[in-house]
């Protein structure tokens, strides 16, 4: 629980404050506020969407604080990629021990990302998958919603610029994970 997390962090010497998000954009605004108050670390406790919002709140700052992650979402793709414990207190232990990993930050259409960049219907699937369905069937909910939206999907034109080079594609992708 949140009180247990805060107590554990405080016993380890951290001064803590917590903020519960209620709507899209809240985590970005709170991360920006934490920057103004010169926090040494900002901890994103939530799923990949919450993490993305926090990244967007701190990405443009030259002196970013450390970013702690407590994976609490449906998929926790980025946390899994970093081999973070999937239990809350295990993730808190990683933060307390000071384990850090440098990661690249990408930017697409004025939004930042650290895990993956998606566009077109893929992002729509993520946003339109009902929370209730995710709580019932977990990550499989995204596949259900994706197959439901498949007839509406069309190929997308994509241009990628990297190190002053550009590549253009037209794709319709159905993402799968082994």
Ranges and model annotations:
Residues 38, 46, 99:
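Conserved functional loop/turn residues at catalytic and ligand-binding sites
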Residues 170-178:
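Conserved small/polar residues in nucleotide/adenosyl-binding loops
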Residues 49-51, 76, 120, 178:
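Glycine-rich nucleotide phosphate-binding loop and flanking beta-alpha elements
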Residues 27-28, 51-52, 122:
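Short, well-ordered alpha-helical microsegments
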Residues 50-62:
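Short Gly/Thr/Asp-enriched flexible loops that form oxyanion-binding sites at enzyme active sites
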Residues 1-42:
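ATP/NTP phosphate-donor binding region
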Residues 45-47, 72:
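Glycine-rich beta-strand-to-loop/alpha-helix junction loops that act as flexible
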Residues 3, 11-12, 21, 60-169:
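Catalytic core of DAGKc-family lipid kinases
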């Amino acid at each position: 629980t949140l009180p247990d997390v805060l107590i554990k962090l405080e016993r380890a010497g951290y001064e803590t404050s917590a903020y519960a998000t209620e709507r899209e954009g809240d985590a970005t605004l709170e991360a920006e506020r934490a920057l103004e108050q010169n926090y040494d670390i900002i901890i994103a406790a939530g799923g990949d969407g919450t993490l993305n919002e926090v990244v967007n709140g701190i990405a443009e700052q030259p002196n970013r604080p450390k970013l702690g992650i407590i994976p609490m979402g449906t998929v926790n793709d980025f946390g899994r990629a970093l081999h973070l414990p999937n239990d809350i207190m295990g993730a808190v232990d990683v933060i307390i021990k000071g384990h850090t990993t440098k990661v690249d930050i990408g930017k697409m259409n004025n939004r930042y990302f650290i895990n993956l960049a998606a566009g077109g219907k893929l992002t729509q699937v993520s946003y339109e998958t009902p929370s209730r369905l995710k709580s019932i069937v977990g990550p499989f909910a995204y596949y259900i919603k994706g197959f439901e939206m498949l007839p509406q999907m069309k190929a997308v034109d994509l241009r990628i610029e990297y190190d002053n080079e550009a590549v253009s594609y037209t794709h319709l992708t159905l993402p799968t994970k082994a």
